[in-house]
Amino acid sequence: MMKGMDISKWQGAVDFAKVAASGIQFAILREGYRQAVDGKFFEYVNGCRANNIPVKGVYHFSYALNADQARNEAAFCIAQVEKAGLGKDTVIFYDFEYDTVKQAKEKGVNLGKNESVAFTKAFCEYVTSHGYK
């Protein structure tokens, strides 16, 4: 079994030397949401690199209202992954949660199971078509 961490800007300042010393073997970082980069993404990538903590994956928190927006989020995510210098072996996760549904409802869009599946497929198919996992 491996010991990893999942972090986003909500964790604030991270002492990556202390994290590495604690036995953390990999990281999964929030890359962003909508068309916005997580405020700590690049800092966390650099902190992981400086302390030999492999970034095994990133996740994009979705606020898509349709499949086209989900694909656009995938394209945005890939652009940030490339900008960070992460390789094609980086696993890209699609994060569709309650807040995704809540925000959509506030905009008059009801998201159910069918939309969740369609958006997830659109995002993941885009990611895999660009050589990522």
Locations of the language-model features?
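Substrate-binding cleft of extracellular glycoside hydrolase catalytic domains
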Residues: M1-Q25, L29-C124, T128-H130
